Swiss-Prot record:
The gene is sconB. It comes from the Eukaryota. It comes from Aspergillus niger (strain ATCC MYA-4892 / CBS 513.88 / FGSC A1513). This is Probable E3 ubiquitin ligase complex SCF subunit sconB. Pathway: Protein modification; protein ubiquitination. Keywords: Repeat, Transcription, Transcription regulation, Ubl conjugation pathway, WD repeat. Residues 27-38 have a biased composition (Polar residues). WD repeats lie at residues 339-376, 379-418, 420-456, 458-499, 553-596, 599-636, 639-670. Component of the SCF(sconB) E3 ubiquitin ligase complex involved in the regulation of sulfur metabolite repression, probably by mediating the inactivation or degradation of the metR transcription factor. Component of the SCF(sconB) E3 ubiquitin ligase complex. Gene3D superfamilies: 1.20.1280.50, YVTN repeat-like/Quinoprotein amine dehydrogenase. The keyword Transit peptide does not apply.
Length: 670
């Protein structure tokens, strides 16, 4: 049996036997003066063994001058290829760790000169070796390692094999990866390094985050955030307009008066008289001056004057996230407005203006920032049941049967409309269309563009609420006859009736078109079906057809032939409240009741909704916040000593009015 070949040392020569090693040890003890000679001899041998290896694999640095012309095959050898971790043209090539290399250098310098030279030769061999040779060297070294050494290798390698992929990849791919992270993970990623922070805080990532969460519920995490404060958007718009009007094309500032803010600009009378509004008051002029003072502080020749100041999307998300968290946990401040002498029946707020109507026949305008009453509008002879205002006008409806148009900034009554034979309970205007609901069981449509009016008949009891959708030219109405109707303004007919409530329906609110309802969340209630105005066929059949009994079945539109030619469809979802103590979510195209909200102990008088939540107020003096997708009651507020009769909803606050003569505003702004 042949003996095994001797093990080859890492320096290229055969390893010495055990006897030879012992003999050398004895000789070294007897002849210590020969150690320097042995070291010098070993260094020469090592140099002769290492130099050819280095010259072969690193010819540019170690090959002699006379051997420059090497064979092309040797240059393109598979063993001389770089691995992907050591490609000089790759960004993922790992850089030296400065603290580790400093420690390594200090430990190396603590060794004798001969040991330093031997270790350096080993490093040189490994550094010059191609990928295949490196693997062989590593396998041989690890085969001789004991467990403590293998444990050291395992611990060290765990950190070395990590690659900074964010820094290595192109920014576009890094942004794509970061867009999959949630808010918490993004904030942690920004703490890794400066490079990670620059990418994790970039507007590309946070704009995507805002798109997923603001004004809608994220499908992945279920988190939704309110819109940006409209007041900030308007102030930014006004500043841009003022800056544009005070500079000409040559960059010089003319002696011109800045443009008035949007809420102080003169407008035409909504009644169609064509008269201009009066000149702005001292208060309105002061608003303009405040906007101009901020511009006057900047030098006229500075570039900053022309630059639009953008707010980083991360700050936008941060601001909205705080508001959304306050909504979730019910953290809010409350301001109470007192001044009416009878129950508050209607209200609306916008920016810092709050308008309230009461059974004391007055309308009060409040400053929400200070809580002070600005002015009182008087003119109605009976209780005020409904109102709505915009930047230029306020329209109110009263139990005296009249509709009045006011200049709420001055308190002047511009015009009065009478057309109902009973009190006006509800109204809503959009653009040039005004719809009013009355105790005379009708809905009246007022068109201020062509000065025309029409009556929509079909309800058999008081009509409590109306909503106009200008885009689809339709109107929703809710009545004490326990139904909700959808009307076509072009044909002046009812195209769908929603049945399901067993109490008088008090409110109907179309949800924004951005609202999305998952199909798996649907609670189909087959006993709540819609019909059409004919009512000549069974409810189940009419709900299946989705059309009038004498109409031709339309395959393209569930709302009838008039919606087949590309006409905008009505809002897809509506919510209603009734005195049966329930709130219902409906799909308008099919008439199905998708969800019923239970929780109030008595009839629900007030209702407001957006894409994130539903707010309701009831006879039980409670206000409830609902998730429209799950039907869960997220929060209940108390405080009123009388039934809650009206609600106004904003992105970061809501207001409630009650028969206790008080108005409460809940602000979730951080």
């Amino acid at each position: 049996m042949s003996s095994p070949p001797p093990f080859t040392s890492i320096f290229g020569g055969p390893a010495e036997s055990a006897e030879e090693i012992d003999a050398d040890a004895d000789n070294s003890q007897l002849k210590p003066h020969n150690r320097s000679n042995v070291t010098a001899t070993s260094a020469k041998l090592v140099g002769k063994s290492v130099a050819p290896f280095l010259a072969k694999h690193v010819p540019d640095q170690y090959a002699p001058l006379g051997s420059q012309n090497r064979e092309p095959a040797a240059l393109s050898s598979a063993n001389s290829r770089y691995c992907y971790r050591h490609r000089p043209d790759r960004k993922c090539r790992r850089q030296a760790d400065e603290p580790t290399m400093d420690k390594l250098q200090r430990e190396l310098e603590s060794l004798p000169q001969s040991d330093q030279q031997g270790i350096a030769h080993v490093w040189s061999l490994f550094s010059a070796a191609p990928a295949k040779h490196r693997k062989l060297i590593l396998q041989g070294i690890m085969a001789q390692c004991c467990f403590p050494q293998l444990s050291f290798i395992s611990t060290t390698v765990r950190d070395l094999i990590r690659i900074d992929f964010i820094a290595a990849l192109p920014p576009e791919i890094s942004f794509k990866i970061l867009c999959y992270l949630d808010t918490t993970s993004l904030c942690k990623a920004a703490q890794v390094s400066r490079r990670w922070r620059a990418l994790a805080d970039d507007d590309v990532v946070w704009h995507r985050m805002c798109e997923q969460h603001i004004h809608r519920k994220c499908k992945k995490c279920g988190w939704g955030l309110p819109l940006l404060d409209r007041k900030r958007l308007r102030e930014s718009k006004r500043e841009i307009e003022i800056r544009a009007t005070t500079w000409d094309v040559n960059g010089t500032s003319p002696k011109a008066t800045p443009a008035l803010p949007e809420d102080a600009s003169p407008v035409a009378d909504s009644s169609g008289t064509g008269k201009r509004k009066p000149e702005p008051s001292e208060e309105e002029t002061a608003v303009v001056k405040r906007h101009c003072q901020s511009l006057a502080m900047r030098p006229e020749g500075s570039e900053d004057y022309f630059k639009t100041r953008y707010r980083p999307w991360k700050e936008v998300y941060k601001d909205r996230f705080k508001v959304g968290t306050n909504w979730k946990y019910g953290r809010c401040s409350i301001r109470i407005f007192k001044g009416h002498t009878n129950g508050v029946m209607c209200l609306q707020f916008e920016d810092n203006i709050l308008a309230t109507g009461s059974y004391d026949a007055t309308i009060k305008i409040w400053d929400t920032d200070t809580g002070q009453e600005i002015r009182t509008l008087r003119g109605h002879e009976s209780g005020i049941r409904c109102l709505q205002f915009d930047d230029t006008k306020l329209i109110s409806g009263s139990m005296d049967g009249s509709v009045k148009v006011w200049n709420w900034r001055t308190g002047d009554c511009i015009s009065t409309y009478t057309g109902h034979r009973g009190g006006v309970i509800g109204l809503h205007f959009d653009a040039t269309i005004l719809a009013s609901a009355s105790v005379d069981k009708t809905v009246k449509i007022w068109n201020f563009e062509d000065k025309s009016t029409c009556l929509l008949r079909g309800h058999t009891d008081w009509v409590n609420a109306v909503r106009v959708d200008t885009a689809s030219r339709t109107v929703f109405s809710a009545s004490d006859d326990c139904t909700v109707r959808l009307w076509d303004l072009d044909t002046k007919s009812c195209i769908r009736t929603f049945h399901g409530h067993v109490g008088q329906v008090q409110q109907v609110v179309p949800l924004p078109r951005e609202f999305e309802f998952e199909e798996h969340d649907v609670e189909c209630e087959n006993d709540n079906l819609s019909t059409v105005s004919g009512d000549t066929e069974p409810a189940s059949l009419q709900a299946t057809l989705g059309l009038e009994s004498n109409a031709v079945i339309s395959q393209s539109s569930p709302f009838g032939p008039s919606f087949e030619s590309g006409r905008t469809a009505p809002p897809r979802y509506i919510v209603t409240s009734a005195l049966d103590s329930t709130i219902r979510l409906w799909e308008t195209s099919t008439g199905r009741c998708l969800r019923t909200f239970f929780g109030h102990l008595e009839g629900v008088w007030a209702l407001a909704a957006d894409t994130l939540r539903i707010v309701s107020g009831a006879e039980d003096r409670m206000i409830k916040i609902w998730d429209p997708r799950t039907g869960k009651c997220e929060r209940t507020f108390t405080g009123h000593s009388g039934p809650v009769t009206c609600i106004g909803l904003g992105d970061s606050r809501f207001a409630t009015g009650s028969e206790d003569c008080e108005v409460r505003m809940y602000s979730f702004q951080s």
